[in-house]
Amino acid sequence: MAHQTSCASYTSGRVGLSSATAVVADAAGREQTQHGSPLFPIACYAEDLSCYSVAWHWHEEFEFILAALGPIHVDVNKTRLTLQTGQGVFINSGALHAVEPAEGRALLHSGVFQPRLVGGMDTVF
């Protein structure tokens, strides 16, 4: 028998959850959540998209999204991607994006992190 996980126990790390969205954004669509801390600016999330979708938003951080149980639709700017279980996508800094289940139960894992973790600060790279 498959283990059933409730939305409340599977969803971790998001603030402002509602039945419609897992993102708190300003009028321009910029996400207001701080991911990680100033000393370690990275956060990882596990989300059950059966309970809500992730509304259109953007942020300065990079984001990796992995379909832990798919399929899931990931919309980035004007492109819709459908990720099957085990597939992932990289979302660049400043890219407008949204996520929703394609059908049935859908779970995702994501990592959101500052670009300086990859390129450093005050460098030419």
What do these predicted regions represent?
Residues 94-124:
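Ligand-binding loop in jelly-roll beta-barrel domains
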Residues 1-82, 87, 95:
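Generic protein-terminus/edge-of-domain signal
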